[in-house]
Amino acid sequence: STIPTNLPEYKIIIPTQTDKDKSISDSAKFYLVTCAPGAAVYERFGHSGIRVHDSVKGIDEVFHWGLFSFDTPNFIGRFIAGNTDYEMGVYTTKFFMLQYIERGSSVYAQELDLTTEQKHELYTKLWNNYRPENRKYRYNFIFDNCATRPYQLIISTYNYKISTNTQQEQITYRDIINKYVPIGLPL
């Protein structure tokens, strides 16, 4: 799911750190945040992000890849055709959580078991993703979205190599999705 960017101006959050101070303490904690689905079309599949909480530096932010604008010309047509550009955002955790509390959706956080070096590496990667030239991307329902972006950053930070069992039954993405999405999903 995503959060529209055309919210009232007072709700738009500016990152709390300047370019000169994008550092964390060694005691910072990182969480994979998963939000339950909501009723709106853009909420139907939930949302994900990465929370950084550092009480020493006063940081408590969620990095997420779910911003878009309904004001985009032909938004619905572009969305259906797979031509929608999304953007990464950085919100205070309080504001991020408020979005889901207001709509009655659950939010789950799983702490990532990172070494001190990995914490600093992931934080650098997050801010690099937020650079103006990196924050926009072409949304893809399967391959490039608010779940795959944090996944790729986390996996690359852990330096994991993931292998799959190639002996499994051949199944299409459509087969997988049809198990979870009712026919005639009200959009």
What are these regions (language model features)?
Residues 2-187:
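Soluble extramembrane regions of membrane proteins in the secretory/endomembrane system
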